[in-house]
Curated annotation (Swiss-Prot):
Family stated for the protein in its record: Belongs to the UPF0349 family.
Pfam families assigned to the protein according to its UniProt record, in alphabetical order: DUF1450
Species this protein is from: Staphylococcus carnosus (strain TM300)
Name by which UniProt lists this protein: UPF0349 protein Sca_0544
Length: 78
């Protein structure tokens, strides 16, 4: 079982698509895209993704990618 990273399509238009594509190439991560993740406040203020249900944010696409991997490393139990 892999960690699951979920993206909102609106947030992908802000640079999240770069992160999505990078993670999609990683066989150790499952990546999903949704029309909306119901986190409009976070989504409107910057880049974010849900990592196993937890909100992870970043100031730039590279920062978000780094924060996602850090979150997985710190919280993943499998």
């Amino acid at each position: 079982m892999n960690p699951i990273v979920e993206f909102c399509i609106s947030n992908m238009a802000k640079g999240g698509d770069y992160v999505y594509n990078k993670l999609d190439q990683d066989p150790g991560v499952d990546v999903l895209e949704y029309g909306c993740l119901q986190n409009c406040g976070v989504c409107s203020s910057g880049l974010y993704a849900l990592v196993n249900g937890d909100i992870v944010e970043g100031d730039s696409p590279d920062d978000l990618l780094q924060n996602i991997y850090k979150h997985i490393e710190e919280t993943w139990i499998f």
